[in-house]
């Protein structure tokens, strides 16, 4: 399973990436919205982990652009914006799940496994 992490905080990105790689996922990372749109245009991912607070391009804008061309790829928002209004907006914009920072790596791993398992089952049916 291929994952893309879109997160500008490199230390956090590295920790999440290493944790998910230990779970057997192939992980790519990008640190800007422009880089994210370029990668998603060129490559196919099973799941995208998306921060909302990115430089020069808001994560919600990235999500909306992704959803114009791709309704299949699962998207998990991972953001410091943890209030109910932001969660509702993210899910309404097409995210499949939403986690607020700070978070536990074990919980993130469980959510990623759940989302990718559901995607795998949907393709088999």
What residues fall within each predicted segment?
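N-terminal/domain-start alpha-helical segments
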Residues: 1-122
């Amino acid at each position: 399973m291929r994952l893309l992490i879109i997160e500008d905080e490199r230390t956090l990105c590295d920790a999440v990436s290493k944790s998910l790689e230990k779970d057997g996922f192939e992980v790519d990372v990008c640190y800007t919205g422009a880089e994210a749109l370029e990668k998603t245009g060129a490559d196919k991912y099973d799941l995208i982990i998306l921060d909302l607070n990115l430089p020069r391009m808001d994560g919600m804008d990235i999500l909306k652009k992704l959803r114009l061309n791709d309704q299949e790829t699962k998207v998990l928002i991972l953001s410091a914006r943890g209030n109910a209004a932001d969660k509702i907006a993210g899910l309404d914009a097409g995210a499949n799940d939403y986690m607020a920072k700070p978070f536990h790596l074990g919980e993130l791993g469980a959510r990623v496994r759940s989302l990718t398992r559901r995607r795998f089952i949907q393709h088999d049916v």
